[in-house]
Amino acid sequence: MYKAITEDDRRQAIIQKMIFQEIRRLDQSALMSLLKNKEGRWFLMRMLDATGINSNSFTGNSTTFFNEGKRQVGLELLGRISELGIDAVKLKQKAELEYIEHQLRARELAVEYTDKKEGSIE
């Protein structure tokens, strides 16, 4: 912990700690609100996808560093969800299931559409 040299330093350290705690509280509240909302869960999953969290980041060139930076953002977000506790983790899992279901349904619709198009050409 930071040890104050002067009274002003001590006061500044207390102020910084209080600001940090308030920002953390607001971040946690916002993240939980996001997880409790279906559209928020969708957005969360889109952002996690954008970070490449479940992808191989190695390219064999300097793009690897960029990809790892994006991936680190996703890992940070997952860590913050875990810090919120079991309810947040369950909501994240719900988001993952909703996301997979949506992707499967979109694929089904695309296959149906292309099958109809191919059938109408004949």
Where are these regions (language model features)?
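Intrinsic-disorder/low-complexity detector
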Residues: M1-E122
